[in-house]
Structures are given as C-alpha cells and as structure tokens.
C-alpha cells in the first residue's frame, strides 16, 4: 500500500465518522471507528521499518502544476518514518484514551474524532511531503485542525481565546514559512525538498540565504512554541486533555523541530542559524522551566514544561547544525552525537509527556479539578496513575534507570563538547552549560513538587468537586504502557537507537556516512563531566523540591509577561485593521471594482516590465469601415457619459446600448453565435434591471464627486491601454505553441461542427460545468433575496 492509499484511507474513515454525526445510535461508537485510522497507519509504518532501516525509501509522485514544480510528492525516508511512527503510535494511544475520557452522552464524539483524525492526516502529510508547497498546505491544515480541537468546547471563553491565539500565531509563522519556500524556489527553481537539499551550496551562496533562514525559523519557532512565540501553548490547554496529550506534547509542537531537522543540511551552512537556534532554544528551555514552577494548574505546569523541553531539543538541533559544514572528521562525531541526542530526547519526551498529560486527565476527569492546592494524598485512590506520573516526572528530570537520564546526559555531553566546535569558545561553552544545568534543576523541581503535592500527604476528599473518585483500569492502560517503555528504553537503548533513530539521522545528513559518527548509547560512560552535571541537577533539584519553600518566592515575582504584550498588540492590530476594513469596504461597488482593477493593472504592468517589451515589427488591425467607426464612437461617448449620469434608468439603457454595439461588432466579425448570445444576455439583463427598480428604495441622487469620477476615467483608460498593449505584444511573436492545429481536429475529437461548442462542451467541459454551478448558486441567492420575508417574534429569531 502506497502513502497515497494510506492517506486516502484516513480520509475515508473521516467521511464515515461524518455520516455518524446525525445517527444517534452510532455516535457512541465513533471512537472505535476512529481507532481504525491509527491502527492502519501504525501497521503500515511498522511494515516499512525493515526496508527503511536498510537505507531504502518509499516515494510517490503525481504531477500537478508542473510548470511551477508543484506536485503531489511524498517520500518516506528514515526521518519521515521516525516522526510517522510517533504520530501513529501515540495517536493510537490517544484515540483509545479519548474513548474513555469523553462522555458518550454529552460530547459530540464524531465531530471530535473527525478533527483529531484531520490533525493526524495533516501531520503525516507534513512529515512525508517532498514538495515545499505541499508541506505548507499540510502545515496550515494542522493549524486549522488544532484550532478546531482547542475550541471543541466552544461555549467556554478560555477555549475560544486559546484557539484564536494559537491560530493567529501559528498561521503567522506559516505565512513566513511560505515566503521562505518561495525564496528557495527563486534561488533553486525547484520545490522538491530532495532537490533543494542537493543544491544547499547554491542556496548558501545566495544573497537571500539569511532572509530564507529567518523566515523558516519563524515558521519553526511559532509552531514549536519557542520564545517569544510560546504564549499560545499554555492557553491551548483549554482543549480536552486527549488533545493536549497528542497535539501539544507529542506531535504538533514537534512539526517545527521536524522542519529544522529536514533542512539542517541547508540551514546548517550558516553560523547565524547555529547561534540563533541554539540560543533561542536555551532561552526557551530556562524560561519554560522557571515559569512552570509558578503554576498551580497541572496542565499549565505541563504546558510550560513542554515549552522548556522543546527548547532543549531545539538547542540540540542548533548545536548539531554544524554537521552540514563538517560532515567528516572528528568534529562530525560531535555534531552527529548532538543530532542523535536531539532525536533520542524527542522520542523520550513524547513518551513521558504523553503519559503525564494522560495522568492529569484521569485526575481531572475523576476529581473535577487540576489545582494542586486542592489535591493531596491521591496515591491511595489512584495508585496506577501515581506510579505512571512519578516515573514519567523522574524520567523528564533525568533520573537514572529511566530513558530520560540517557538523553539528558547526552545533552550535557553536547553542551560541554561545544568548546571543541569552531563556532564556540570557552566562555560561550560555560554560558550555555550553566543555562542547561539551571533549567534542568528547575525541571526536576516542578516535576517532583507536582507529584509531592498531588499524590503524597493526607487525602482530603471534602475539597474535591467530584465525590467518590476512582481509577478505571482501562482508563490508565495507555499511560501505563508508555510508562513501561521508560525503563525498557534505558536498558536496551540501542534497539531503538540503531533501528529507528539512526535511519532518521541518515536522512538528515543525506549522502553522508553517519553510521561512523553516530554514538553507541551506553548507560555508563565513566565518571566524567556530563555525569557530574547530572548528579548536581539531581541533588540540588531534590533539595529544592523537598526541603526549600521556594514556591512563595517564585510567585512574588511580578513581571510584565509577553502575553500582555501580545494582547496589547492584538488590540492595536484589531483597531487599525478595523479602520482599514471600513475604509476599503464602504459598500460602494464601483469602489471595489476600482481597487480590483488598480491591483490587476499593477500586477500586469510589473509582469510586462519584468518580461521586457519585444521589438514591434508587426501590427495587425482588422479592416474597418464607416459602421465600425460609428459604432466605436458610440461606445466611447456612452462610456464617458455613464461616468457622469446619475439617473438609474438612463444608466441601464445606455449600458444596454453599449452591449448591443458589442453585438454589432460580433456580427461584423462573422461570429453569429456570439452575437446571438450577446443579444439575448443583454436583453434579459436590461429587462431584469428595469424590473428590479420597482423593488428598490428611492435613493436621493448623490452629488457628482469630481475627484472620484476622475479616478474612474483614469482607471478605465489605464485598463484600455493595458489591453491594447497586451494585444500588440501578443502579435510580435509566437512565445507559446499555437493551438489552432488542436482546434483544427475539433470535429474528429469531439463530434462538434461548431468550434465554440466544441470548446465549451468538450475541451473546457469542467470549466463550463463550474460556470454552470456558479449560475445555479447565483440564481438560488437571487431567489432567496426575492422571497425573503422578515421573520417576526423572538421565538422565530431564535
């Protein structure tokens, strides 16, 4: 089964779910139907794993807009498979978890699962797309589906605000990403990602290289919640917990990181990229970790924790970006180890953070609150959830015998090794190492503190909104499976490292022998500096979490947050955009037409200037006599007159006369079909206009605005000049192959003796079909307007 068939299967399952929207009997089974999608996807990607491990890839290419190199092009290589397995397997756990979390009576289940599968479909599209424009389409689809999932409980104000904020920020980043892709196309002449990577040196030598880096980083940073674009992620926690566990910890927030991985071979050729990504990641890491200690809502704690961990991964991607400059030698081993660590920690983070979110969802579902100030002693009521969240928090903190310890130690190893890299010196190495250590200490602090406050101590049921909470086993099953993998990966890391992570690393550095530089993950590397840093984090972190009352000091600090800045700028944007809309949308049709024609004129003039004007060597003008001259003069005079006349009936009549003059031109040019069509349409249109006057209100005649009329005349003359110029340019050469021979065989190809009928009914049949649909829709609109009667009464309006 190809990738196209897989994505088509996901669409089919979504369509089936849509049919259950109106069937109450089947609505409660929506989750079980939705489970088919991640099961099919997981089986497919696991089936492809042995082949990809050997360096092969699956490729599907369907030509589309070949002139612009926009094709439906998919490629499943090691990196795509790594992310696809995360998306499908975590998706399987989340969809099953959602069947236990959501109410079958009160929640609109089919709608939720359609949104969730739409997001899964979009994410798989991002990671398998081999065309930049195709990737952008899926990129924005994730923003749309994320918006729909966050606002799923649309009656809540927090859901509405969080959805709008996340949509605004991520779509802004998506537009920046599109601009970056367009610049890449300008430089390389291709949208194929594999071809772009092959031309990395050409891009690096271009004067657009730095703008390309900035635009792609904007796309990645907004999607992966990097400072200062992180503010949307905590507000997105208003979504149902399955959404938070899937989108905002394991998948969507990793899309930006995937983008950085995919274009490392190109972007890593710039030291600007390495510095920018590394320091933005480290700032995000420490910012998220410190802010997590200030929260009381468990999902808010995990949201800032996710921001911090994403920053950690991004910083490793930045540090490892130098592999593009040094693909061989001793330096390549350091870069390769750091990139490997980034992939390793990304996988670990998806597991322990998904388990943590699911645990929080169980507690919220059963107790009615996520406020750690109201929770205590829950290990007696939720023993399985206690173990799951405890081990997951310890793994996140980098405690031995859990997978997080291995990737955290590799992170420290990468930080201290930067002193050997040409982009860094001893001072920078010390700075980034200190930032990493401090952020890691706070990671342990908020993780252990949350477990202590929620699960340890005396159980106080009276403070809980819901009474008699319990822990259904099937509810805990997905998070328990994720938790079991945490120590398993610690003891057999190379099973995952060699079979899943190494193929992904090969795809990041296409054409390089990364097997020689990829590290062998070991639980013991001796007593070295990374181990010492890990021990410092553990000791200091536990002391702060269990012995020091740091919480009161953390919440005494009052700072003007970036959220306040966002809200202020959002209000200003809303104010000025409202002013702009009111200026443009003034309910004057001629104003809209004027603006449209002006923009069209500028685009056409710019295109003609860029293309250059050919040498004029021939001008073909049709033969004309007195009738043509008189008709042309009539059209010209009536056109000028229409600019100044204000009587509606007179304007309609004069407009009809112009239409009849066009009919005369068609007759003189021996086009009877066109003349007949023009005559009928002009007559019907004129009659409809006159009849409609009886239903229109009496509007006082407006005074003639000389400036406005002058603009109309100038725009009209400008369009006339442009059209005539285009006709003359078209006469100067055959830049495009002629289509006359194509129409010469019209009778044989279509059976139509009339060339116009052959064009409309066969050669451009689809275009004609859609034109007919437009007419039908317009007719329905007119029918509705003519038959609309104002409904009276409050009950009818409701």
From Swiss-Prot:
Which residue ranges traverse the bilayer?
1-21, 33-53, 78-98, 109-129, 133-153, 167-187, 209-229, 241-261, 272-292, 300-320, 337-357, 381-401, 431-451, 472-492, 526-546, 593-613, 625-645, 649-669, 674-694, 710-730, 766-786
Q: Which GO terms describe its molecular function?
A: antiporter activity
Keyword Cell cycle on entry: no
User: What is the membrane topology noted in the UniProt record heading this document?
Assistant: Multi-pass membrane protein
Q: Subcellular location, in the record's words?
A: Cell membrane
Source domain of life is: Bacteria
> One biological process GO term for this chain?
monoatomic ion transport
- Keywords, comma-separated and alphabetical: Antiport, Cell membrane, Ion transport, Membrane, Transmembrane, Transmembrane helix, Transport
Transmembrane listed as a keyword: yes
Q: Which GO terms describe its cellular component?
A: plasma membrane
Subunit architecture: May form a heterooligomeric complex that consists of seven subunits: mnhA2, mnhB2, mnhC2, mnhD2, mnhE2, mnhF2 and mnhG2.
Record's NCBIfam families? PRK12646.1 (NF009286)
Q: Which PANTHER family match?
A: NA(+)/H(+) ANTIPORTER SUBUNIT (PTHR43373), NA(+)_H(+) ANTIPORTER SUBUNIT A (PTHR43373:SF1)
Similarity comment text for this entry = Belongs to the CPA3 antiporters (TC 2.A.63) subunit A family.
What's the name of the protein? Putative antiporter subunit mnhA2
Q: Which organism is it from?
A: Staphylococcus saprophyticus subsp. saprophyticus (strain ATCC 15305 / DSM 20229 / NCIMB 8711 / NCTC 7292 / S-41)
What is the phylogenetic placement of the source species in the record?
A: Bacteria, Bacillati, Bacillota, Bacilli, Bacillales
């Amino acid at each position: 089964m190809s990738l196209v068939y897989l994505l088509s299967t996901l669409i089919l399952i979504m369509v089936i779910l849509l049919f259950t929207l109106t069937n109450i009997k089947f609505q409660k089974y929506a989750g079980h139907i939705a489970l088919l999608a991640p099961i099919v996807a997981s089986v497919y990607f696991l089936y492809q794993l042995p082949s990809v491990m050997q360096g092969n890839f699956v490729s599907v290419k369907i030509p589309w807009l070949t002139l612009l190199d926009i094709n439906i092009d998919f490629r499943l290589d090691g990196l795509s498979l790594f992310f696809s397995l995360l998306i499908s397997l975590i998706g399987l756990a989340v969809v099953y978890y959602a069947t236990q979390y959501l109410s079958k009576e009160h929640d609109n289940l089919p709608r939720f699962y359609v949104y969730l599968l739409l997001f899964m479909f979009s994410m798989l599209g991002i990671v398998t797309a081999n065309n930049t424009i195709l990737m952008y389409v899926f990129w924005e689809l994730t923003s749309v589906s994320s918006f729909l999932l966050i606002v799923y409980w649309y009656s809540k104000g927090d859901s509405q605000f969080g959805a709008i904020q996340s949509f605004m920020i991520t779509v802004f980043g998506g537009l920046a990403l599109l601009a970056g892709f367009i610049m890449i196309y300008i430089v390389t002449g291709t949208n194929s990602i594999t071809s772009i990577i092959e031309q990395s040196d050409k891009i690096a030598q271009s004067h657009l290289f730095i703008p390309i880096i900035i635009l792609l980083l904007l796309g990645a940073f907004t999607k992966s919640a990097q400072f200062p674009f992180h503010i949307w992620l905590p507000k997105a926690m208003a979504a149902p917990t399955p959404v938070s566990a899937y989108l905002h910890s394991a998948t969507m927030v990793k899309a930006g990181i995937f983008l950085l991985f995919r274009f490392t071979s190109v972007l890593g050729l710039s030291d600007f990229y390495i510095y920018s990504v590394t320091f933005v990641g480290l700032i995000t890491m420490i910012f998220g970790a410190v802010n997590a200690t200030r929260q009381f809502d468990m999902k808010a704690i995990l949201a800032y924790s996710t921001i911090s961990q994403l920053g950690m991964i991004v910083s490793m991607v930045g540090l490892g970006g130098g592999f593009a400059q040094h693909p061989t030698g001793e330096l390549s081993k350091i870069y390769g180890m750091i990139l490997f660590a980034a992939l390793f920690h990304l996988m670990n983070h998806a597991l322990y953070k998904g388990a943590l979110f699911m645990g929080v969802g169980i507690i919220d579902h059963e107790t009615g609150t996520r406020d750690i100030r109201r929770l205590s002693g829950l290990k007696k009521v939720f023993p399985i959830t206690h173990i799951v969240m405890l081990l997951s928090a310890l793994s996140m903190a980098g405690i031995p015998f859990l997978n997080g310890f291995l990737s955290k130690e590799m992170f420290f190893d990468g930080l201290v090794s930067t002193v050997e890299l040409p982009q860094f010196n001893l001072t920078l190495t010390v700075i980034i190492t200190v930032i990493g250590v401090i952020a890691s200490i706070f990671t342990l602090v908020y993780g252990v503190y949350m477990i202590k406050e929620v699960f340890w101590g005396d159980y106080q049921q009276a403070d809980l909104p819901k009474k008699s909470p319990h822990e259904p086993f099937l509810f805990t099953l997905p998070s328990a499976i994720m938790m079991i993998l945490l120590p398993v990966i610690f003891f057999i890391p190379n099973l995952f490292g060699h079979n899943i992570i190494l193929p992904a690393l090969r795809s990041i550095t296409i054409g390089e022998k990364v097997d020689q530089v990829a590290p062998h993950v070991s639980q013991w590397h001796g007593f070295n500096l990374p181990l010492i840093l890990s021990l410092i984090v553990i000791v200091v972190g536990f002391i702060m979490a269990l012995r020091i009352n740091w919480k009161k000091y953390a919440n005494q600090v009052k700072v003007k947050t970036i959220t306040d800045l966002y809200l202020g700028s959002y209000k200003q944007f809303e104010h000025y955009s409202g002013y702009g809309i009111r200026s443009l949308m003034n309910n004057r049709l001629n104003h809209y037409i004027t603006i449209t024609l002006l923009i069209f004129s500028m685009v056409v003039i710019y295109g003609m200037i860029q293309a250059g004007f050919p040498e004029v060597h021939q001008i073909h003008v049709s033969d004309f006599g007195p009738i043509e001259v008189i008709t042309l003069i009539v059209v010209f005079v009536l056109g000028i007159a229409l600019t100044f006349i204000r009587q509606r009936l007179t304007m309609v009549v004069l407009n009809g006369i112009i239409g009849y003059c066009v009919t005369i031109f068609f007759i003189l040019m021996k086009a009877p079909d066109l003349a007949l069509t023009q005559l009928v349409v002009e007559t019907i249109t004129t009659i409809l206009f006159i009849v409609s006057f009886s239903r229109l209100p009496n509007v006082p005649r407006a005074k003639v605005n000389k400036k406005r009329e002058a603009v109309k005349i100038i725009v009209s003359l400008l369009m006339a000049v442009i059209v005539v110029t285009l006709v003359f340019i078209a006469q100067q050469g055959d830049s495009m192959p002629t289509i006359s021979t194509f129409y010469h065989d019209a009778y044989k190809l279509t059976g139509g003796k009339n060339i116009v009928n052959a064009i409309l009914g066969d050669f451009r049949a689809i275009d004609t079909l859609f034109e007919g649909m437009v007419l039908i829709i317009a007719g329905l609109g007119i029918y509705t307007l003519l038959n609309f009667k104002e409904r009276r009464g409050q009950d009818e309006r409701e």
